[in-house]
């Protein structure tokens, strides 16, 4: 094992074109000067004119992403957020729930997927842009983990992604603000404790 840079075509054969869609591969890492995927997401949300749909297993957004979602919804954009009803990590799920009132107040539509665990990381906007990859909508993915996403600028792909979202939405229950604010005080307290704890302990290996 050495530090020789391997560039031989034996290991990296030439890639042939296999389609016409324009895709931008974006990476993020904790040691870089920019949070590229988060910045791409913020720009995408802020640029949406009609709709922006998000599927993510964990929702612990940075302030920039949260404000972008709220601003878009307040501007009349149909912003939808889909989360699993039951997550694989209860603490993280409680932390995610602590942010829901913030987005519901601004008009974001929130859905809990009830047909198993939702692990999709999909975002689609205006039948023009979609992005998929390893990134969760959480601060660890944006700021601390090594992640990669494809931003795809193609109508056909966006329509397919939109249809996937809408099909999954049929297996969801919608969360309404008037009901959400009535959850018990001890549940709200648990969410506050959970979100504080996850900011300190959410494992960087969580995917």
Where are these regions (language model features)?
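Charged, low-complexity intrinsically disordered terminal segments
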Residues: 1-200
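Single conserved hydrophobic/aromatic residue that forms the stacking wall/gate
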Residues: 199-207
């Amino acid at each position: 094992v050495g530090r020789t840079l391997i560039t031989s075509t034996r290991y990296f054969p030439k890639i042939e074109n296999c389609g016409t869609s324009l895709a931008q591969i974006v990476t993020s890492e904790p040691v870089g000067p920019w949070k590229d995927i988060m910045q791409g997401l913020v720009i995408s949300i802020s640029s949406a004119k009609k709709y922006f749909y998000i599927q993510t297993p964990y929702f612990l957004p940075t302030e920039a992403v949260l404000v972008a979602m709220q601003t878009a919804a307040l501007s009349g954009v149909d912003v939808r957020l889909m989360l699993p009803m039951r997550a694989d990590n209860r603490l993280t799920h409680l932390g995610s729930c602590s942010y829901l009132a913030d987005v519901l107040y601004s008009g974001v539509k929130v859905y809990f997927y009830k047909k198993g665990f939702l692990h999709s990381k999909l975002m689609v906007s205006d039948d023009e842009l979609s992005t998929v990859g390893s990134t969760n909508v959480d601060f660890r993915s944006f700021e601390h983990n090594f992640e990669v996403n494809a931003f795809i600028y193609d109508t056909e792909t966006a329509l397919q992604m939109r249809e996937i979202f809408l099909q999954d939405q049929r297996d969801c229950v919608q969360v309404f603000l008037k009901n959400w604010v009535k959850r018990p005080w001890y549940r709200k307290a648990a969410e506050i404790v959970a979100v504080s704890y996850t900011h300190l302990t959410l494992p960087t290996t969580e995917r």
